[in-house]
């Protein structure tokens, strides 16, 4: 499972860079764990070059050319890919059980499903494996004769799975009579801060979008002992904000320069992020923190980004190999739809009843002020598995 978490986190950073190429000046928010899980469902049905490309993009491939990989990374990838598909799927099953464990101090609702044109029936073995490893049931539907109705049914199901927070995943005209197969993935997250902000301290302050433009935001504030880390080579300060019970943390990376985000995005890798956010890199400070309230609801058709990363055959009618999924030829993936919902407010990552715990013993720590008033990166991490559940860039209120 540790190897899978590393793969998901590596995919997170690579995918973030790919999205950033076509999203200059715009917010980004997605779930690498969610996307990886959804694509792994598809991967289980592939063979040949289609499977190889997916494994490489998802970072669990023993690719032929390891020359650019350090020895430890070669060994990890070889070990992870040396077994059968079932071993990888089993790791996803174990990871999901940990992340979605009943009794967790947060709410995470997911909607993962494959919809295939009914003239391409699924193998029974594939259906059984999907239920075993992912608790999922691929749906055979009539895109040819009822694509509009199918779109409504998909949106209704996703809405019900996400507590009504994501009601319209598929936009108009996103599926039609030529659609062969679509993959949908949506996530809704609600968490409560370990130390909540007081609503009475929230005031309007400027958020500097760039050197010449500011926008007013509702800026939360609190003074609390928090863990801070410095990235000297990139002139960036990092902050860890725990959620209740410390199951999850929000890791925030703020460049010192207003226009420093692009340099940070270019330089960041999974290995660097793992090093920066390790316990021995963090120091405890008495922090006067100013953090904007914000809401992000981002939708992506992932086809373009995934093709750009090298996952091309899966979208090609002449090249896609889904022979582990169906006996019919010419089945290919039409689209991948991903949508996430996030709200950062005084109580946490979406308004929820509850009270934040107070520190009972004050740590004698140096004081600093951290004003998050210009573009930054953030990650929501599951601490036990070190898996990045969500990855985001906030640069425009």
From Swiss-Prot:
Q: Where is the signal peptide?
A: none
Identify its protein family.
Belongs to the serpin family. Ov-serpin subfamily.
Q: Which SMART domains match?
A: SERPIN
Where, by residue number, is the motif Nuclear localization signal? 74-77
Annotated site, Reactive bond, chain positions? 362-363
Q: Which UniProt keywords apply?
A: Cytoplasm, Nucleus, Protease inhibitor, Serine protease inhibitor
Q: What does this protein do?
A: Protease inhibitor that may play a role in the regulation of protease activities during hematopoiesis and apoptosis induced by TNF. May regulate protease activities in the cytoplasm and in the nucleus.
Provide the protein name. Answer: Serpin B10
Q: Transit peptide: present as a keyword of the record?
A: no
The protein's GO terms of the molecular function aspect are:
serine-type endopeptidase inhibitor activity
- InterPro entries with a match to the protein in the record: Serpin_CS (IPR023795), Serpin_dom (IPR023796), Serpin_fam (IPR000215), Serpin_sf (IPR036186), Serpin_sf_1 (IPR042178), Serpin_sf_2 (IPR042185)
Enumerate the subcellular locations listed in this protein's record, separating them with semicolons: Nucleus; Cytoplasm
**Pfam families on file:** Serpin
Q: Name one GO cellular component term.
A: cytoplasm
